[in-house]
């Protein structure tokens, strides 16, 4: 295993740890939102029901002024909290024409909207940090230290919120999933009332869909979008000095045929396209990639030329502290041409270091 392969594995492990913490935060929020919705449904049964059943025709009466005001206040609170999503709220004039069932259905939509807004914020923050990690892992492997980049908007915009899949970014997919789930929940709600379901039965059915779908949709996005950000951010530092790559799937019993077969192909870095020849290839994909160099001697000569032409000139590249000096001594060049003055590498030494870190000595 090369140094770079090992670092990619460490990045995956770090991402998985962050994902686990993110999932816990989302689960806590989802549970709290359903608890609030549950209380609203219970209040409907208490106010409009008899013997634990609500007559459907009673739900077709106009929404009360009090409930209408509460719904509008909730919409206003949401727009203030998430101004970037305010345009997704229903037109206020339509609220005045709602019946009781529609009022409760709007509450379901608002619950899902709150979940979508929170999920967006949490996933974006996770991806921002992951993009910084990915860039720094790549820069470290090229000899520029472990914390070359700090988080800033210019960096984040390259990777986070990019519409790489079907012309949509992760935020759009969250809202699409939200609207779809709200429609299903509202259909369940209306059909449950029409059947004369008891409060317990209605809430039980809603909870099953609510909990299962919200979590599944969010987890799929976290996993897949994380793979995109990891792959793209780690690739960025390599674009200047390398031209080819191949994909690197986790080869186990869960590896799909797409990822397993794709690993045999070599692609141009400039022609990479997520979902086509670069990770992720599908939902839940966690492929990575590795650099391909056909002729390392030729690459080293080109590296020296691009970085001033003097192989013995001082380089800005630094050796990772855990790599021993003897690991980067070239087999076919004089050690004096590669050696170090304190921690300073020559240009040739930098090239040999990068070759070693990428596993070139193993080929």
What are these regions (language model features)?
Residues 92-208:
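Structured, charged N-terminal subsegments at the starts of enzyme catalytic cores
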Residues 1-121, 125, 208-212, 216-363:
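Activation/maturation switch segments at domain boundaries
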């Amino acid at each position: 295993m090369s140094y770079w392969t090992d670092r990619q594995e460490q990045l995956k492990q770090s991402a998985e740890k962050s994902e686990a913490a993110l999932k816990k935060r989302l689960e806590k929020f989802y549970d709290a939102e359903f608890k609030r919705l549950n209380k609203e449904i219970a209040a409907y049964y208490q106010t409009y029901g008899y013997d634990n059943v609500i007559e459907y025709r009673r739900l077709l009466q106009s929404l009360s002024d009090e409930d209408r005001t509460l719904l509008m206040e909730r919409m206003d609170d949401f727009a203030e909290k998430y101004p970037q999503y305010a345009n997704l709220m229903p037109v206020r004039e339509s609220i005045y024409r709602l019946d009781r069932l529609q009022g409760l259905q709007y509450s379901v939509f608002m619950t899902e909207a709150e979940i979508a807004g929170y999920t967006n914020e949490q996933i974006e923050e996770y991806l921002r940090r992951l993009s910084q990690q990915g860039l720094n892992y790549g820069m470290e492997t090229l000899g520029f230290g472990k914390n070359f980049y700090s988080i800033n908007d210019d960096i984040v915009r390259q990777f986070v919120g990019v519409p790489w899949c079907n012309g949509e970014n992760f935020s759009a997919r969250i809202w699409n999933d939200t609207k779809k789930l709200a429609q299903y929940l509202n259909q369940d709600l209306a059909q449950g009332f029409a059947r004369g379901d008891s409060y317990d039965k209605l809430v039980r059915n809603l909870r099953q869909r609510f909990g299962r779908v919200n979590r599944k949709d969010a987890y799929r996005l976290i996993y897949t979008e994380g793979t995109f950000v990891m792959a793209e951010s780690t690739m960025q530092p390599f674009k200047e000095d390398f031209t080819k790559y191949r994909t690197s799937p986790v080869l186990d019993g869960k590896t799909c045929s797409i990822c397993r077969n794709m690993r045999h192909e070599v692609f141009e870095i400039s022609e990479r396209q997520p979902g086509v020849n670069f990770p992720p290839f599908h939902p839940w994909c966690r492929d990575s990639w590795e650099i391909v160099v056909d002729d390392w001697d030729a690459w080293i000569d080109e590296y020296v030329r691009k970085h001033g032409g003097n192989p013995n000139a001082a380089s800005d590249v630094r050796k990772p502290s855990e790599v021993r000096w003897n690991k980067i001594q070239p087999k076919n060049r004089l050690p004096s041409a590669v050696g170090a003055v304190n921690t300073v590498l020559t240009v040739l030494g930098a090239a040999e270091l990068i070759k070693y870190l990428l596993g070139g000595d193993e080929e």
